[in-house]
């Protein structure tokens, strides 16, 4: 059974909407849960697609279809404590976007769902529960 609330990051969203191998497990983990993410999620999703364009991993048409699928996922975007995020960024030596996700998990006392290894490791260093994708 999924936790009541789950913080989801762009790597997990991208894995779902681009039909990556983790997709079925990610969907199972989130069934029945409220998904939340920092306000930065749409920017991160867009950045992920632009990176895929540069690596020739996705066409514009497929990216637009994936974005349409993303827009159908019910994810509540939320503000975070920017001061706390900066503290986390400094303490954990991570980018602000990763710190936003960890701050969101701490603020809502909710586990983090990610397929990003470095983010997973940083979250665990401050005792944020990370949902495992099996």
Summary of predicted features, one role per range:
Residues 1-40, 53-64, 126:
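Short, well-structured N-terminal submotif of metal-dependent ribonuclease cores
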Residues 1-5, 38, 102-134:
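Acidic, PIN/NYN-like endoribonuclease modules and their adjacent C-terminal/linker elements
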Residues 10, 23, 42, 46, ...:
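A general structural signal for well-ordered alpha-helical segments in protein cores
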Residues 13, 45-49, 104:
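Buried hydrophobic packing segments
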Residues 36, 76-78, 131:
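General small-molecule cofactor/ligand-binding pocket signal
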Residues 46-76, 80-82:
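Active-site-proximal, substrate-binding regions of enzyme catalytic domains
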Residues 72-118:
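Active-site neighborhoods of divalent-metal-dependent phosphate/nucleic-acid chemistry enzymes
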């Amino acid at each position: 059974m999924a936790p009541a609330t789950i913080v989801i990051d762009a790597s997990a969203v991208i894995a779902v909407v681009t039909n990556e191998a983790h997709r079925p497990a990610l969907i199972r983990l989130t069934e029945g849960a409220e998904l939340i993410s920092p306000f930065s999620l749409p920017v991160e999703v867009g950045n992920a697609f632009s990176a895929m364009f540069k690596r020739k991993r996705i066409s514009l048409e497929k990216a637009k279809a994936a974005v349409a699928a993303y827009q159908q996922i019910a994810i509540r975007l939320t503000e975070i404590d920017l001061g706390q995020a900066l503290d986390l960024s400094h303490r954990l030596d991570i980018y602000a976007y990763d710190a936003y996700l960890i701050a969101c998990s701490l603020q809502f006392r909710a586990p983090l769902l990610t397929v990003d290894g470095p983010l997973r490791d940083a979250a665990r260093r401050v005792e944020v529960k990370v949902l495992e994708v099996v």
